[in-house]
């Protein structure tokens, strides 16, 4: 009996179905690893923001949930999971329920084209940066669905503001990304990072595209709805904007989506302008820092991951500090800044970049 069972198990592992199962498992492993890493990254961002905000306001911040309050975000998430999920009695339940998921999924898909390190990217596409812009434009649709489905004037106004703000600041963002693609001769995120590796710190696109860098930062803050661009969630005007009618896990999804978007923006700033995983030392790419064997390749990949995350988290100090130092703009000021200031500057920067590339041919 035991021999027959062993033979059956052996025949299964040799069959075609077992190969398909193994293929499916190996397909899910990198995706699940990425989701786990993103979750940990969001928890770290929440803790950093609370601690930095407390320091700016001369408070202590979270300190009881885990060492130094590191588990406070996890405690808040568990609390939201067990809260009652209320539905508006006269709202559109389908749109109300689907809206948060659309916002979160569209942002999660953006992580698939981000190179976290050397040979550490889920999909290296030739149109990676433009795929990110296309995917990120889906998130405002979810916010508009949430605002309309809530059947609440404050929620609907917040959804309309979110859609208008996203459209206004995605357009200046696109010429900045196109300028980087022209300099790197590629739209692949991996190629863009490798194009910045030759001259170390001075080879970063930050110095080659200073105007585009400033426009990109401002547009990214507006896309993330961070102060001074948090008009869709202005508490004094709209209670909580499109989140007004939400509670429980659906409200938690919006909470997670805002920090996911913030992390995506920081990582793309790192990839496009701060050299990605490259060290700020000239002529020493991270791929050539170690001898080529399996152990050193794993070590080099780990180091490149740490370098990318260190740059991204250092950049996070800018959006966190602006939250407590700059006043909120009016809606007309926000739209004028996007259409009348940033868009002409971004187009002018693209024209200069194109001209310089043509002259250098």
UniProtKB/Swiss-Prot annotation:
Write down the top EC class of this protein.
Answer: translocase
Name the Gene Ontology molecular function terms of this record. NADH dehydrogenase activity; oxidoreductase activity, acting on NAD(P)H, quinone or similar compound as acceptor; quinone binding
Q: Where in the cell is it found?
A: Plastid, Chloroplast thylakoid membrane
Q: Does the keyword Disulfide bond apply?
A: no
What is the protein's major site of localization? plastid
Q: Which UniProt keywords apply?
A: Chloroplast, Membrane, NAD, NADP, Plastid, Plastoquinone, Quinone, Thylakoid, Translocase, Transmembrane, Transmembrane helix
One Gene Ontology term from the biological process aspect of the record: photosynthesis, light reaction
The reactions it catalyses are: a plastoquinone + NADH + (n+1) H(+)(in) = a plastoquinol + NAD(+) + n H(+)(out); a plastoquinone + NADPH + (n+1) H(+)(in) = a plastoquinol + NADP(+) + n H(+)(out)
Q: Which Pfam families match?
A: NADHdh
Q: Where is the signal peptide?
A: none
**Entry's transmembrane regions:** 25-45, 102-122, 125-145, 246-266, 298-318, 334-354
* GO cellular component, as recorded: chloroplast thylakoid membrane
E.C. number(s) listed in UniProt: 7.1.1.-
Membrane topology, from the record = Multi-pass membrane protein
Q: State its role.
A: NDH shuttles electrons from NAD(P)H:plastoquinone, via FMN and iron-sulfur (Fe-S) centers, to quinones in the photosynthetic chain and possibly in a chloroplast respiratory chain. The immediate electron acceptor for the enzyme in this species is believed to be plastoquinone. Couples the redox reaction to proton translocation, and thus conserves the redox energy in a proton gradient.
Tell me, how does this one assemble?
NDH is composed of at least 16 different subunits, 5 of which are encoded in the nucleus.
Annotated family = Belongs to the complex I subunit 1 family.
NCBIfam families xref list: PRK06076.1-2
Any idea what this protein is called?
NAD(P)H-quinone oxidoreductase subunit 1, chloroplastic
What gene is behind this protein?
ndhA
């Amino acid at each position: 009996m035991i021999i027959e069972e062993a033979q059956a198990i052996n025949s299964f592992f040799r069959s075609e179905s077992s190969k398909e199962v193994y293929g499916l498992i190996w397909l899910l492993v990198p995706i699940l690893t990425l989701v786990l890493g993103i979750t940990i990254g969001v928890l770290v961002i929440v803790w950093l923001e609370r601690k930095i905000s407390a320091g700016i306001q001369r408070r202590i911040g979270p300190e009881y949930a885990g060492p130094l309050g590191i588990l406070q975000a996890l405690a808040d998430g568990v609390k939201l999971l067990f809260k009652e999920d209320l539905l508006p009695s006269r709202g559109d339940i389908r749109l109300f329920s689907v809206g948060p998921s659309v916002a979160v999924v569209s942002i999660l898909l953006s992580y698939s084209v981000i190179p976290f390190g050397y040979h550490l990217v889920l999909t290296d596409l030739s149109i990676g940066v433009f795929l990110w812009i296309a995917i990120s434009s889906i998130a405002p649709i979810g916010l508009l669905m949430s605002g309309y489905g809530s059947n609440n004037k404050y929620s609907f106004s917040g959804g309309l503001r979110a859609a208008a703000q996203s459209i206004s600041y995605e357009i200046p963002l696109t010429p900045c990304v196109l300028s980087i693609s022209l300099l790197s001769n590629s739209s692949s995120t991996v190629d863009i990072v490798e194009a910045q590796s030759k001259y170390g710190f001075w080879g970063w696109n930050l110095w080659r595209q200073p105007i585009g860098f400033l426009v990109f930062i401002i547009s990214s803050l507006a896309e993330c709805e961070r102060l001074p661009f948090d008009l869709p969630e202005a508490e004094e005007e709209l209670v909580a904007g499109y989140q007004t009618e939400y509670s429980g896990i659906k409200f938690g999804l919006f909470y997670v989506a805002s920090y996911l978007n913030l992390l995506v923006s920081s990582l793309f700033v790192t990839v496009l302008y701060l050299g990605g995983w490259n060290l700020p030392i000239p002529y020493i790419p991270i791929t050539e820092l170690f001898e080529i064997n399996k152990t050193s390749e794993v070590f080099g990949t780990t180091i490149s991951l740490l370098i990318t995350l260190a740059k991204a988290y250092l950049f996070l100090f800018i959006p966190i500090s602006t939250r407590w130092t700059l006043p909120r703009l009016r809606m007309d000021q926000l739209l004028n800044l996007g259409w009348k200031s940033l868009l002409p500057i971004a187009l002018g920067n693209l024209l200069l970049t194109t001209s310089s590339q043509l002259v250098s041919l």
